[in-house]
UniProtKB/Swiss-Prot annotation:
Keywords tagged on the record: Antiviral defense
Phenotype caused by lack of the gene: When this gene is missing the Lamassu type I system does not confer resistance to SpBeta in B.subtilis.
Organism from which the protein derives: Bacillus sp. (strain NCIM 5461 / CCTCC AB 2011126 / NIO-1130)
Function: Component of antiviral defense system Lamassu type I, composed of LmuA and LmuB. Expression of Lamassu type I in B.subtilis (strain BEST7003) confers resistance to phages phi3T, SpBeta and SPR.
GO BP field: defense response to virus
Protein name: Lamassu protein LmuA
Gene it is expressed from: lmuA
Cross-referenced InterPro entries: Cap4-like_endonuclease_dom (IPR025382)
Length: 315
């Protein structure tokens, strides 16, 4: 049999697990003040939340033990040492993994987490073993006091991870359906890819890599509005072909008609609008569109614009 190099596939699998871990943290924290994610920076990913900085290393390896965490392969820094290196003494460090040796797991101390519901700290026995083996200095010892282990609720399998994350978003009442959750996961995954590819050589590069809470909030708002758009469109008494054309026109709005949409929203009487059913509300907004743009014909575009306005006014 021909020998096959699986290095690329293994690396991709590891990166997918890393992305799933980032998205899990995003789901639980994006609505908090000053939330920022920086992928592929000083660690696999970096989190800023309020005044705290977290350096997170992600390991998709099976049966990780204290022995493996402190091992120095080919003389290189161990997993523990790498995670202790970046940032300042007071920063928080986490090692995300999915599979841990039973003996190592039994000795960990469980406690309530901040980024995630549950985290684990090393026992005194485990810390002593690591300190002695790696000959850690005083600063490294102090840094290790803020180092924790987190066992993810999904394995190093992207399909199982995505299934869990979709359910998590629905459970957190962020989205009402798995289909919309799938769209969000695609958007977040793509954004993590884009930011990860930015090579850091200056401080401005680090700024470009940031994914902040405002961006994440907008992603969820956009998906919710798309869901609402489809629901309202389904309630209108127009035929299937017209509905398909309306959806097509919607794609043009951000590029060509954003200003008209904003003018319509400003002109709308919210109290009057909220007393109407979907059909009445859309007809009211289409009449406003004609007042703003007299040559706006009663076409699929006017329906798309009116529904888009209605969705945003309802937020």
């Amino acid at each position: 049999m021909i020998e096959i190099d699986n290095g690329g596939a293994i690396a991709l699998k590891g990166f997918n697990y890393q992305k799933a871990s980032i998205i899990l943290v995003m789901i639980h924290n994006f609505e908090k003040d000053n939330f920022i994610v920086i992928p592929e920076s000083q660690e696999d990913f970096e989190i800023h939340l309020g005044q705290d900085t977290y350096f997170i290393q992600v390991k998709g390896t099976k049966k990780l033990s204290i022995g493996k965490l402190k091992s120095r392969p080919s003389g290189k820094a161990s997993i523990i040492e790498k995670n202790l290196s970046p940032g300042n003494v007071g920063d928080i460090r986490k090692i995300f993994l999915w599979d841990i040796a039973e003996l190592t797991k039994n000795e960990l101390i469980s406690q309530e987490g901040t980024l995630i519901p549950m985290k684990h700290s090393l026992s005194l026995k485990q810390k002593t073993e690591i300190i002695n083996t790696l000959d850690l200095d005083e600063e490294q010892k102090n840094r290790m006091n803020n180092q924790y282990i987190y066992i993810t609720p999904f394995p190093n399998d992207i399909n199982l991870a995505l299934t869990f994350l979709k359910g998590e978003m629905v459970n957190e009442n962020l989205l009402v359906s798995n289909d919309r959750a799938k769209l969000v996961l695609g958007e977040l995954s793509l954004e993590i890819d884009r930011k990860s590819e930015i090579v850091v050589s200056t401080e401005s590069d680090v700024e470009r890599k940031k994914i902040d809470g405002n961006y994440l909030k907008q992603v969820f708002i956009n998906i919710k509005q798309k869901e609402m758009f489809d629901e309202i469109l389904d309630n209108l008494s127009i035929n299937t072909i017209m509905k398909k054309k309306v959806k097509k026109e919607k794609l043009r709005i951000p590029l060509l008609y954003q200003n008209i949409k904003e003018q319509t929203k400003q002109k709308a009487d919210i109290n009057l609008l909220m007393r109407e059913n979907d059909e009445g509300a859309i007809n009211y907004l289409r009449d406003l569109l004609v007042e703003i743009v007299p040559d706006m014909k009663p076409t699929e575009l006017s329906i798309a614009l009116a529904i888009d306005c209605f969705c945003e006014l309802g937020e």
